[in-house]
Regions:
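Short, well-ordered beta-strand elements
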Residues: 51-61, 113-115, 135-138, 170-172, ...
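Short, low-complexity disordered leader/linker segments with a strong preference
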Residues: 1-54, 96, 161, 195-197
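Short clusters of hydrophobic/aromatic residues that line enzyme substrate/ligand-binding pockets
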Residues: 67, 97, 157, 189, ...
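Aromatic- and charge-enriched surface segment that lines or borders ligand/interaction sites
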Residues: 103-147
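Bilobed "Venus flytrap"/periplasmic-binding protein-like clamshell domains
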Residues: 201-217
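N-terminal lobe/hinge region of extracytoplasmic solute-binding protein
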Residues: 58-107, 140, 202-204
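Solvent-exposed loop/turn segments at secondary-structure junctions
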Residues: 61-65, 95, 121-123, 177-180, ...
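Surface-exposed binding/hinge segments that line
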Residues: 106, 110, 151-194, 208-213
Length: 217
């Protein structure tokens, strides 16, 4: 699988993060003839960087000190980390919720039981395969009133029973119907036993985190 590099340069506070993406590289379809000066310009300009799999994107603010998606509060950080992490569900460009880490899910007629089947073979960027335990830990972490103060609490998870069925299924038993509950399941799924999310975040998204360099112009 080819890798492409995404370098994010903060335009105001000037912070650089580098992400590496999985997927096919960009294609350069330029035709026709050019003189030597034009060719040199193309070689040194954005087209050459794109051909090498690199993209520079400016954002208007510095990133949070922590890159753990359960701790980030700044919009710029969330936009960057959106490409690194996925929840059971993930919104598309139109705001529709689609399965991500999950393959499929069902909701009971009384809207109290949500049952998710995990997608087979989904791995975190460190090579570890996603398990139901990772999913449950991630969402319980955000619903635990006794969690560290820097964890952003998701009230919708507070009184929900979460449990595993078999090797690939996670269930959420609500105490009362919540029509918005599915939207909260876009919360990032993290590896339970990984402890470096603040500085070296690991998710399942289309891009993986490579590096972060503060004050890089």
């Amino acid at each position: 699988m080819k890798k492409r590099i995404l370098t994010l340069l903060a335009a105001v506070c000037l912070l650089s993060a580098v992400l590496s993406g999985c997927g096919g590289g960009s294609q350069n379809g330029t035709t026709g003839t050019t003189d030597q000066s034009t060719a040199n310009t193309q070689t040194e300009g954005p087209a050459a960087r794109a051909a090498a799999g690199e993209l520079n994107v400016g954002i208007a603010q510095d990133l949070d000190s922590s890159l753990d998606p359960h701790k980030t509060v700044k919009a710029g950080t969330r936009e960057v980390m959106f490409n690194v992490f996925e929840g059971l569900l993930k919104p598309d460009a139109s705001g529709n919720l689609n399965p991500a880490v999950a393959e499929s899910y069902t909701v009971s007629e009384d809207h109290l039981l949500y049952t998710f089947k995990l997608r087979t073979g989904v791995k975190f960027h460190n090579g570890q395969e996603v398990t139901p335990e990772d999913v449950i830990w991630s969402y319980q972490r955000c619903g635990d009133a006794n969690a560290p103060a820097d964890i952003i609490q998701v009230a919708a998870f507070a009184n929900v029973e979460m449990y595993q069925e078999g090797d690939d299924t996670v269930c959420f038993q609500l105490q009362e119907p919540n029509n918005e509950f599915a939207s909260y399941l876009t919360t990032a799924v993290l590896p339970k036993d990984y402890t470096e999310q603040d500085t070296a975040p690991v998710g399942t998204g289309p891009f993986r985190f490579v590096s972060r360099t503060a004050q890089d112009s």
